[in-house]
Every structure is written in C-alpha cells, then in structure tokens.
From Swiss-Prot:
One function term, GO molecular function aspect: large ribosomal subunit rRNA binding
Protein name: Large ribosomal subunit protein uL10
Gene source species: Maridesulfovibrio salexigens (strain ATCC 14822 / DSM 2638 / NCIMB 8403 / VKM B-1763)
Record bears the keyword Protein biosynthesis: no
Family: Belongs to the universal ribosomal protein uL10 family.
CDD domains given in the database record: Ribosomal_L10
Length: 173
C-alpha cells in the first residue's frame, strides 16, 4: 500500500468518524470470512459501517475528531464499527453478534466523545432504541390531553344521565 492509498483511507475513515455518533472497536481474531461477512450484513441492515484498518491509520484518522479518546487505544487486530444515527442500534447489533460468536468480542467504544469500556457498550445495547423512546414519549404526551378531554366530557355526561333518570322516573309515575 503506497502513501497515496494510505492517505485516502485515513481521509475516508476520518470523514466517517466525524459523522459518527458511536465508534466501537472490536476484536475479530479467529472470525471466519463467512462470519465476518454475516457481521457486516447485520450491521449494514441497521445503517452501521464496519471497517478493518491498520492501527496506525486508525490512530491518524481518529485524531482530531470527537472520538479522539480511541486514538491511543488501537492495538492488535481490530475492526471499527461506526454508527451514525442511532448508537443503541449499533451497540445492539454488535452485542448480539458477540453473543452468537465465540471468537468475536467488543473491546471499547466512544459515544459522542465519551469513552465506554466493554461493559458500557453492553449496557448501551440493553437500552430501548431511539424509535421506541420517541414512541413512549409521544404516548405519554398524548395521554395527558386525552385524559383531560375525557374528564371534561364526564361532567355533562353525568348531568345528562341524571336528567334521563328524572325523566324516566316522572314517566313511570
């Protein structure tokens, strides 16, 4: 690989790191080609990139980005998983694959510039997704006016029931 190719890889990875909300560093030693292809497909389905890069190139690419906390931690063979929109979806996809595979491990991550160890990534993977949280918030916000309108409707309804009962009572008499 010549200097120009290395510079291009660094530039591409730096651009991805600048857009990323999460970067997870994984150990893929012992992972077969089929398994790694399956991992990439799983990650692609949730809008996440996975890239294997030399440690020195990764160090240079992550320096000067929000995920700079990872720059000095690249050692041994590693694959970098980069998530853009939903960090929980990226963490879930990686954690699920790590459960299935005996040779694939999460090492550490950077979530919007904050360092997370392996336990932190696992904890993040157990949180509800962005869509689920938005749905719960919307449901909660919608419940307040609905309950208020129902409460307001009960007053005239109760009054109408009393009038109907009085009418029935007078008709019976």
């Amino acid at each position: 690989m010549n200097r120009q190719e290395k510079a291009q890889i660094i530039e591409q990875l730096k651009e991805k790191a600048e857009r990323a909300s999460i970067a997870i560093v994984t150990d893929f030693k012992g992972l077969g080609v089929e398994e790694f292809t399956q991992l990439r497909a799983n990650l692609r389905n949730v809008g996440v990139d996975c890239q294997v890069v030399k440690n020195t190139l990764a160090r240079l690419a992550f320096t000067g980005t929000d995920h700079e906390v990872l720059a000095d931690k690249f050692k041994e063979n590693c694959a970098i998983v980069i998530g853009y929109d939903d960090p929980v979806a990226a963490a879930k996809a990686v954690a699920d694959f790590a459960k299935e595979s005996k040779t694939f491990d999460m090492r550490f991550a950077s979530l919007e510039g904050k360092y997370l160890d392996e336990d932190g990534v696992k904890a993040l993977s157990k949180l509800p997704s962005k869509e689920e949280l938005l749905g719960k918030a919307l449901g909660t916000m919608n419940a307040v006016p609905t309950n208020f309108v129902s409460l307001l409707a009960n007053v005239p309804r109760g009054f109408l029931n009393v009038l109907t009962a009085l009418k029935d009572q007078k008709e019976a008499a």
